[in-house]
Amino acid sequence: MNILSRALRRPKSPTPNGKKRINLALQGGGAHGAFTWGVLDELLNDERIEIEGMSGTSAGAVNAVMVADGLTRGGPEEARKRLSDFWRAASRDGDMSKLNRAISERLFSLIPIAVTPFQPWFDAMSRMLSPYDLNPLNINPLKDLIERFVDFEGLRADARPLFVAATNVQTGKLRVFTRENISAEAVMASACLPAIFRAVEIDGVPYWDGGYLGNPVLFPFFRATETEDVLIVQINPLERKTLPTSTREIVARANEITFNSSLQSELRAIEFVQRLIDQGRLPHGMGPSQYRYVRVHRIVLEGLGERFSG
């Protein structure tokens, strides 16, 4: 939490009550989504902070809608409770089929994927069969969990900006779902890993995981919110000090690079725009033809050594 502590020492985006207003951008695509839960629990418990807007992709989208739903229902404490209840339900063993268990582990495991008991079985099967073969009934435990925990009608009525990213399979373009059109299907689309699930269709358009094109998306914040501070909760490491040599390690690292590429591009664009503002080549301000400074902070999942979990 050191990066956040440094950002809070000199609040530049205060609310009338003196709190630090931030936008939260929650990454997905990794095996450690519960790390984000822990970070969010601390942030929601910090009375210095107020969340203005949220963006999430894949598991990050799931966490974002859980927080948004809790804030709408009863504030930070309710958001903490809903996160806790959801993650405990997602990790509960229960009476699941082998397929359901493997899918749940792949999406929500509280421990690295490489050591979950059904993952080797599922990996082997998914190399031979597509989700249309392996999962003919289109079973998706995520859908049941999302619908059980989130009041989407109430969420759509809330004023807090919310953005969920998905990938249009046919056009290869990014789709950002906003608060006004958020739904369980939109969250499922954002978390639709194509090796596991059939594409999620919304209004006849098929979608896959949003991590391919926006993990997470930052640009919607710049017009929809006032704060200039964006806090990214990042679970895919940008750098590795060791060279992957096994098949599992190579696949894991390739996935990390793939699911970080869009974030890298957005961060470069932010830096470029701010350099042009400093040079006086772009107008600075909040107007429709003006550009803003953005202060980006990151909390990164580290300390797991150089072990890969694919």
For the regions a language model picked out, list residue spans one by one.
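Small-residue-rich anion-binding loops in enzyme active sites
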Residues: 1-25, 160, 169-170
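Structural motif
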Residues: 14-17, 46, 222, 291
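A short, acidic, amphipathic alpha-helical segment used as a generic capping/interface helix at domain edges
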Residues: 277-288
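Acidic, Ser/Thr-rich peripheral helices and adjacent loops at domain boundaries
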Residues: 244-277
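Patatin-like phospholipase
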Residues: 6, 19-25, 30-134, 140, ...
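Acidic-glycine-rich active-site phosphate/pyrophosphate-binding loop
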Residues: 11-14, 34, 192-193
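Active-site-adjacent alpha/beta core region of enzyme catalytic domains
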Residues: 23, 100-233, 238-242, 286-310
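Hydrophobic alpha-helical membrane context
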Residues: 70-72, 221, 241, 254
